[in-house]
Amino acid sequence: MNKWGVGLTLLLASTSVLAKDIQLLNVSYDPTRELYEQYNKAFSAHWKQETGDNVVIRQSHGGSGKQATSVINGIEADVVTLALAYDVDAIAERGRIDKNWITRLPDNSAPYTSTIVFLVRKGNPKQIHDWNDLVKPGVSVITPNPKSSGGARWNYLAAWGYALHHNNNDQAKAQDFVKALFKNVEVLDSGARGSTNTFVERGIGDVLIAWENEALLATNELGKDKFEIVTPSESILAEPTVSVVDKVVEKKDTKAVAEAYLKYLYSPEGQEIAAKNYYRPRDADVAKKYESVFPKLKLFTIDEEFGGWTKAQKTHFSNGGTFDQISKR
């Protein structure tokens, strides 16, 4: 071997020695499996190109509230990508995430959004068109349990907000409306993907209250000949949020790559992947490209209608809150 060959061999050997093998754990909520399977591959390629290091991202999925509890109880997540800010706040309250986490990334650390829609069987046999149709006698509703599922809490508050707007902001009438809706719920799964499987795979229920991305996935991937989406007249702006888990990344020395992993969600490639997986992108150019996918509807926010997640959680989903009250048969 000539001296150039020897030199190249040594250079390649030294490069491989210097390259790190890094593992991250992303603890996420229920229906983000497909999104992060694609995104993880893209980020790994990006990080390899930028640094030469190999990064493998493992995923964990479940109801957002249950996932937050697992991180509180010690699972070593480098990042969390959860359904709502309250679940990240709960981890921060235990000291595992900085309490100012929501200010660390743009758009209140919510790189994409969604909303709540209805999935019905082809032909819409029960003629479901808006929230008021879900309380009619004989309509079987599928939604997850708000005690464990972030998506279910968005579902619940979307229904409550609709009822407020149609009853002069009367809270008692809104509670009666949501109680009537939940009387029609046939199965309460622990997470959003479980509810989708109940409706799609097991054939139970007339209507699934769902994340928009789940409804689009079900129709586009599982058969437009079997299901159709009903977009209600109004719904809630759902903002899934993300954060590094400070205590874990400091311990594992993965802070730089974990932060880059979340920041890359805001990049054009990250936003494109979000849109392809039926999440509403924040990036204006990407949003324009996919505007035909996402119908326009009146959206209200958690802050406008419920005073933010801390107040909403206490009022509706804490022990003895409105969900417990309406659940008493």
List PLM regions with ranges:
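Bacterial N-terminal signal peptides that target proteins for export
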Residues: 1-7
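N-terminal signal peptide c-region/cleavage motif recognized by signal peptidases
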Residues: 14-16
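Ligand-binding "clamshell"
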Residues: 91-106, 217-231
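A conserved helix-loop-strand patch within extracytoplasmic ligand-binding domains
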Residues: 92-165
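Ligand-binding pocket segment of bilobal, Venus flytrap-like solute-binding proteins
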Residues: 166-233
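A bilobed periplasmic-binding-protein/Venus flytrap-type ligand-binding module shared by bacterial periplasmic
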Residues: 116-124, 239-256, 273-277
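Extracellular/periplasmic juxtamembrane helices and adjacent flexible linkers that interface
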Residues: 249-329
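Early extracytoplasmic/lumenal segment of secretory-pathway proteins
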Residues: 19-94, 104-105, 211
